[in-house]
């Protein structure tokens, strides 16, 4: 919901600015959720532009992170053939397009954005001129390390005042990156939070469970649902808990999601989990913190290991 809401706001702001060269740069903390959001943006843009988007998709939308292929698909260049020299030329053109952020909407990571602003390497600076005069959306902004808040605040202020750049910070738990003097709250959450639709989750706390053995005993005794999500703080703990639960719950399909998985396997496993949940299969998912930034799995019951406030 908030992803589409912020994109709609950015488009309205772009219309008000009456600047066709203004780009929207949508930034996320993890590569694991970029593909999901990118596909949703593809659907929206294709719905409105149809053939224009099909002919030149990379004019309108681009995905960029460290795993992104530098060779773009769906090229409609009539001169594109298997000739070795021309293929290399196409590769260089594609690489330049990806690394310079020329399209109207870019989906990328915090790392790519901040490297382009703070780095002095030519590779990162290729896109600097396209960051200027743009609308930058930072989703799940609470994942930024607090040690960088002051530096980011100063840089954002300079970009906003001198380079006509707008920053939209999105999160359910807004950190103190920007002060009230330089930032505007777009939404007052109080009226929304009083709506009964948000009163759909019951939270229970148990601080007596201080280790994985105690949790496993409690979980084995009390768990009665058809599906559950267990989130812990480390990859090592996720694997340990997964092995224990898999042995005890033979009639459930158990999945472990951690950064030990390569991105392709992670995406494949998330798709499989989502399909199982949609058909109400008996399933238990154990994960570390990679699940917390918009991966989009909905289980009947969730368990969260004790963690810092910005992770809750």
Enumerate the language-model features and the residues they cover:
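Hydrophobic positions on the alpha1 helix immediately C-terminal to the Walker A/P-loop
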Residues: 5, 9
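Conserved Walker A/P-loop ATP-binding site and its immediately adjacent core
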Residues: 21-46, 65-68, 176, 235
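SF2 helicase catalytic motif II
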Residues: 111-113, 124-158
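Conserved strand-helix element at the start of the C-terminal RecA-like helicase core
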Residues: 23-34, 222-246
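Inter-Walker segment of RecA-like/P-loop motor cores
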Residues: 48-118
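Conserved helicase motor
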Residues: 62-74, 235-236, 254-270, 288-292
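Conserved RecA-like helicase motor core of SF1/SF2 enzymes
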Residues: 260-261, 282-312
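Interdomain hinge/linker at the junction between the two RecA-like core domains of SF2 helicases
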Residues: 172-223
